[in-house]
């Protein structure tokens, strides 16, 4: 609220549910965007006719993606043959996966986070379910929570593609800067892009010769970001819609042989 009152530009790197105001932007996708894209992918790329859904109750992220997927599925003629849910803290998904296996869907959309996704996929394979598992960007790092065999063919929507040259360079620079061996998850490049977008806005205001801190300067920063047309970041190119949500490519990551491609 204070940022809105003062006109300071804010870019939220990773909250798809934050309230958007005239001077507040997102660097990440909103939940409906991901759910719709995955329904499209199921039908257009996987030729799926039936789907099951597995989501977390009481979780805005999970329910948001689930609702968007189901709505788009209805529009596309993708039949939802089973819907299963779990509560925060649950770890045993045998019952839900047994039900899903019995429904025999072509795909299972599981808009949940990687740890629970790994448990669910492992339980599904044990129950005899061979459907393709699909997730949102919360699936990132799922390969650390289930076997390569169980994950084979699973796909998820991501804000960036790990294999691109720009991402590879970012990962190497990140590991060197913080003296770590682990590859950063999606939140690091999103935070980097958020800072980059702010810098581009500031640069535009400076080039106009405006005085920092004035209302004209603040508005120039906002206008520069709002009017971006394909500005390149680590996670993709940025333009913004009327609600200050990013219009950027969606990367579909597939788990193959234990690797993300």
Model-flagged regions — what are they?
Residues 40-47, 70-78, 98-105, 122-129, ...:
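Sec-exported extracytoplasmic/periplasmic mature domains
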Residues 34-37, 84-100, 165-169:
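Structural motif
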Residues 91-95, 101-127, 197, 253:
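Hydrophobic alpha-helical
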Residues 121-192, 205:
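Extracellular/periplasmic periplasmic-binding protein-like sensory domains
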Residues 80, 260-261:
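Residue-level detector of beta-propeller blades
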Residues 1-2, 50-56, 104-114, 120, ...:
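Periplasmic-binding protein-like
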Residues 1-82, 130-159:
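Extracytoplasmic ligand/sensor domains, especially the bilobed periplasmic-binding protein
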Residues 174, 178-188, 199-260:
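Segments of small-molecule ligand-sensing domains
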